[in-house]
Amino acid sequence: MAHEPECPYAAGNVIKFHVKTPGGLEATAVAEIIKVFEPFTLSSVVLVRMACSSLGLEGNMVLKLFDRRFATQLRRDEKIRPWTPEIETEYYQFILDGGAAEFVTQLKEEEDSDDEASDDEDGDYEHSEDEDNDDEASDDEDSGDEEWSAAMDETYLHNHMLDLYKTEVQVYSNLKEIQGTDIPKLLASTLMSIPFPGQTSGDYTDVPGILLQYIEGFPLTDVEQYAPRESWQAICEDAIRIIHRISDLGILNEDVKTRNFIVREDTENAFKVTMIDFALCKFRQDYQDDYDWDKWKSIQDEEGAVGYVMQRRLKGGFSYCRSARYEKLDEEFRKAE
């Protein structure tokens, strides 16, 4: 595989993890990986064959693991060096020495401070791997910040991945009424233990994840290849309808991409769209009022992220018509543009 060394997520491998259904039933499950969805970005996504009859979890399902070690795009975006076993050894010692717990507390305190200064930067943390390129920036910042070690990087990533996992689980809970139709069914949450010598707790090493209904189909980006031209308009409109439905249920998706829609044949000569990937979402209750919510809806433009992109891609095969709700947002927030 093209991933970092010792990646366990390869076709044919068998993995073991704890499973908890939305109804609260729990069991230990073993699953065989039968397909890997590459490249890994924020999470490691694989198709597994489940055989957990005690919970009724049998057959092919999607397992999405929030594993910091193999979050290759996230590491690249955050300028964090690729994972190695040597880094893991350093991280384990950091955990045993109590450094990880202290660092997570520090991160949360800084995050709370950033939340209070809501108009400041989002609190993205600078990593010093490219130290020469960051000299000017560091001169302008508080000089008390220390260079992060590899163990600190891993602690930050673990904490960040846990937040992404919690967000995605909460989104699925909030969208329960459209599970199995417009989004996959959330079948269970999972936890995979990563033991190490001297370990007393898995708080900083265990890998959380979710088990999802497998939707067999093709990404919206490939609609030209798999669907007849006369169906493109309806398929793209269905994707936009799902965006509106999710918005109506109080979700703001900061990562709407056309590849995050799966299209499958529903009935003869018809297609159904399903949306996936909700780790980078916000919730209505996170915003002060309707004005604040609408402003960020306008900035994010979830509808346009599909409509404009697919209109350009399909070159006349799909005509995007701005919806009334987004025309209203444009009128209110984009007058100056």
At which residue positions do the language-model features occur?
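C-lobe/activation-segment region of protein kinase-like
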Residues: 228-238, 247-253, 259, 263-337
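Long acidic, serine-enriched intrinsically disordered low-complexity regions
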Residues: 115-143
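Conserved hydrophobic "DFG−1" position in protein kinase catalytic cores
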Residues: 47-50, 214, 263
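Conserved beta-strand elements of beta-rich interaction domains across eukaryotes
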Residues: 52-53, 68-70, 191, 216-217, ...
